[in-house]
């Protein structure tokens, strides 16, 4: 049996460790819909997992389009996202999180009577991680389950950070996950986002984020491949 997973990364620094690991394993690079990509296959006990890594670019539109392309063009069975994010509440630098709930914090129809984040016509606006993928991630030591917010801003404003915390109850903030989750939810594709906390989403956020981003650490790639190995061994996910 063969399944396909799409692994989405925003920028070169986040994608780099995954690309290096994939190339060491014989991965083949290509361009998919304008995005850098690499593909490998993992095999175990008669099961094959086709793994497609994509560097989508920073922000919601880039993330959403890459997700839609992977689903439409490659028929992925599930999506994993990995990258850095800012701490909003209860987290600190170097923490590793598996995101449980996703919301677009910058979606704003308050001028026409909606609450912050709420979409018109009853459209869903709060998305949940796939339980099976989340369970696989939480088997890794030290992983923290957290609610994340997303927006097309690099969050470095303490006032806005506090507003997002109080309004949405988020613990972390990034620029892609809720967009990926929204596409996956609409198309019925399981997804999970994995994040490492790089900064405190405050006035010093850029410097601390840049310092961690430039290190190009392999910890998220390690976590991602551990999840994929567990997925291959999980009989209940291959029925």
Show where each model-derived region lies:
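His/Asp/Glu-rich mid-to-C-terminal helical/loop segments that flank catalytic regions of hydrolases
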Residues: 201-239
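Short loop/turn motifs at secondary-structure junctions
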Residues: 1, 75, 92, 144, ...
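Active-site-proximal beta-strand elements of phosphoester/diester hydrolases
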Residues: 51-57, 147-149, 194
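Zn-dependent metallopeptidase/amidohydrolase metal-coordination segment
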Residues: 178, 182-212
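Active-site rim beta-loop-alpha module in soluble metabolic enzymes
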Residues: 111-172, 178-187
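Short, small-residue-rich loop/turn micro-motifs
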Residues: 102, 152, 195-198
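Metabolite-binding pocket within alpha/beta catalytic cores that recognizes anionic/polar moieties
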Residues: 2-128
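Short, well-ordered secondary-structure micro-motifs
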Residues: 18-19, 91, 109, 158-161, ...
């Amino acid at each position: 049996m063969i399944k396909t997973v799409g692994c989405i990364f925003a920028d070169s620094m986040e994608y780099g460790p995954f690309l290096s690991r994939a190339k060491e394993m014989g991965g083949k690079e290509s361009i998919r819909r304008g995005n850098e990509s690499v593909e490998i296959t993992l095999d175990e006990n008669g099961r094959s997992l086709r793994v497609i890594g994509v560097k989508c670019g920073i922000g919601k539109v880039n993330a959403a389009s890459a997700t839609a392309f992977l689903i439409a063009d490659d028929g992925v069975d599930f999506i994993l996202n990995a990258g850095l994010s800012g701490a909003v509440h209860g987290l600190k630098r170097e923490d590793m999180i598996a995101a449980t709930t996703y919301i677009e914090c910058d979606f704003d129809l308050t001028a026409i009577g909606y609450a912050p984040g709420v979409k018109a016509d009853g459209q869903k606006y709060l998305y949940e991680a796939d339980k099976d993928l989340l369970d696989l991630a939480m088997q890794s030591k030290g992983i923290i389950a957290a609610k994340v917010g997303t927006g097309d801003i690099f969050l470095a404003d303490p006032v806005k950070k506090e507003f997002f915390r109080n309004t949405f109850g988020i613990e972390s903030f990034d620029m892609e996950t809720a967009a990926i989750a929204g596409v996956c939810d609409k198309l019925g594709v399981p997804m999970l986002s994995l994040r490492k906390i790089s900064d405190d989403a405050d006035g010093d956020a850029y410097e601390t984020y840049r310092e961690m981003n430039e290190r190009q650490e392999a910890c998220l790639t390690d976590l991602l491949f551990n999840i994929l190995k567990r997925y291959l061994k999980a009989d209940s996910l291959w029925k």
